[in-house]
Amino acid sequence: MEKMXVMLITLFLFIAATVAEDADNIGEAIIPENPKFKKFVTDGTSHVAERCSSGSEALHGEGGLALCLFDSMENCLVEHGAAKVNQRSLFVLPKGSTPIEPKDSLPSFIPSPPIPPKSKFECWCDSLISCVCTWTSMVPSTRLLNNQQLGQGFYYFQYEPLLQFRTVLRTCSLESARTCLNAPNVATSPLGRLSHSIHESCVYPSGAESGTGSLPIKA
């Protein structure tokens, strides 16, 4: 079982690394045609304006602004429920999450959490976007479910379409930051409007107009 778990981890990391590498070339990146994601790219610019126009010194650098763009767009995805499937969230921000003060460059991707040792790993897919994974402890005579160890008892593995989308967002955040920083007074300029056309046309270069609209906010 442990060998199988190691093989699965290796496979997931290989897929993630491959997708991240492929997305470095935006022209070759494959974007999941999900209308919720398209609308999220449009409406997420309000978060960009709110969180990334503070005038912080960290935002004056390309890496800092890119990280803030990515963080604010991901917050938008969560808050608007665009990452939900069957009322379950694909990923959840930490409790008490606040706008970041970027200091480091944007990571290539956010890896999935490690599989607990001595456990049985199982996944099943309930849609084309997400797979639900569970771990069952293999400790003799106890077989404790991970809801006693990891809180929820399951973790939503970032299935390939979502991972691709987040990877492209990461690449486009860097491109948007690079372009926006060439504008005068970037800290006080209407960053949301400035980055809107840049960011959306980067994510959906051949059909940015289809991303217009408003996202329904889910409780």
Swiss-Prot record:
It comes from Glycine max. The lineage of its organism: Eukaryota, Viridiplantae, Streptophyta, Embryophyta, Tracheophyta. Keywords: Nodulation, Signal. Pfam families: Nodulin. The keyword Signal applies. Induction: During nodulation in legume roots after Rhizobium infection. Belongs to the nodulin 20 family. Residues 1-20 form the signal peptide. GO terms for biological process: nodulation. The keyword Signal applies. This is Nodulin-26B.
